[in-house]
Design a protein with these regions (language model features):
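Two-component system phosphorelay core
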Residues: 1-51, 55-115
Length: 115
């Protein structure tokens, strides 16, 4: 099993800075990410893909989801140049990466609520 692509140092800093609001930040990230994934799957428009990928990239980067941010950057930068099949694969890769890292944030949320 591979280790999810999450920068734990970023989470440590966020936990320290956000203190009691950290669980809410995690909830917001998880909920917003689900909405962004839904939007990515629902659209075939390159401009909408780029906009959604840009937004998702920013939040993923802020939350330390390194590989997720890289995949979103790829989609944002290349949405107009890739074939529909390649775009669908990239969206699937983003979805898969989020599925891989989501448990890290769920665990963080659980840990924050118990301490």
């Amino acid at each position: 099993m591979t280790v999810p692509n999450v920068d734990r140092d970023v989470l440590d800093i966020l936990r320290e800075v956000m203190e009691g609001d950290y669980p809410e930040l995690l909830d917001t990230f998880l909920n917003d990410s689900e909405e962004r994934l839904s939007n990515l799957r629902a659209t075939k428009d390159a401009d909408q893909l780029m906009s959604c990928a840009h937004s998702f990239k920013g939040s993923a980067c802020n939350m330390g989801a390194v590989r997720l941010a890289e995949l979103c950057q790829d989609l944002e930068s290349n949405a107009k140049d890739k074939s529909p099949e390649a775009l669908a694969q990239l969206v699937a890769d983003i979805h898969s990466e989020f599925a891989d890292v989501r448990p890290v944030y769920e665990d963080e949320k659980h840990h924050a609520h118990t301490h």
